[in-house]
C-alpha cells in the first residue's frame, strides 16, 4: 500500500550571521527561533575534523518533528560556518515511513547561491516496503537510553556506518 507523505524543508547557513536562507513553508516565530538555534554549529569544531551530524527535535507542541543534517560550509570564508538542511514532517507521518533510509536521499548539501530546491515541498511516496527490520534492537535501546535517561546533554559517537540510520529508525517507534 502506497501513500504520499508531505515533507517541508528549510535551509540554514551563513549570510551575515547564521540564519534561514530558504524554506518551503512559513514558520512561526517560536519555531523559527528554535530551528535557527538548533541548526547552528553544535559545539566546538575544527574544520579538518568536522563530522556531519544529525539533529532531531519536536516543534508545534509535538505535532511536527524536525530531522536535520548539518555539514561544515568549507566554501565560506568565515571559520565555523555550517549548512543545515532540515526536514519537517507531521509526527504521525514519521511512524508511517517504512524505510528511514529515505532521509539519506532527501538530505541535500547546498551549493552557493543555488537554494531554489529548498523552497519546494517534498512529496515522498511511501511504498510500505519495510527494510528496516535488520537493526540490532538491543543496541538501539541502549543508545536511546543513554541519550534520554539523564537531564544532562549526551551524545553518541556514531563510529559504525549504519548507526545514524538506525537512530532515525528509532524516531518512528
Residue ranges of each PLM-predicted region?
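N-terminal module detector in large eukaryotic regulators
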Residues: 1-173
Amino acid at each position: 500500500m502506497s501513500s504520499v507523505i508531505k515533507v517541508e524543508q528549510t535551509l540554514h547557513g551563513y549570510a551575515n550571521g547564521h540564519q534561514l536562507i530558504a524554506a518551503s513553508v512559513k514558520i512561526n516565530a517560536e519555531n523559527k527561533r528554535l530551528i535557527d538555534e538548533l541548526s547552528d554549529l553544535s559545539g566546538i569544531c575544527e574544520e579538518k575534523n568536522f563530522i556531519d551530524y544529525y539533529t532531531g527535535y519536536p516543534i508545534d507542541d509535538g505535532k511536527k518533528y524536525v530531522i536535520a543534517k548539518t555539514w561544515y560550509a568549507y566554501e565560506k570564508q568565515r571559520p565555523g560556518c555550517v549548512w543545515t538542511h532540515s526536514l519537517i514532517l507531521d509526527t504521525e507521518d514519521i511512524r508511517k515511513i517504512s524505510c528511514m533510509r529515505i532521509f539519506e536521499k532527501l538530505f541535500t548539501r547546498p551549493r552557493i547561491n543555488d537554494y531554489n530546491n529548498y523552497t519546494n515541498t517534498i512529496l515522498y511516496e511511501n511504498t510500505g516496503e519495510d527494510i528496516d527490520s535488520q537493526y540490532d534492537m538491543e543496541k538501539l535501546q541502549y543508545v536511546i537510553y543513554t541519550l534520554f535517561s539523564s537531564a544532562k546533554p549526551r551524545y553518541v559517537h556514531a563510529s559504525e556506518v549504519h548507526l545514524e540510520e538506525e537512530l532515525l529508525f528509532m524516531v518512528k517507534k
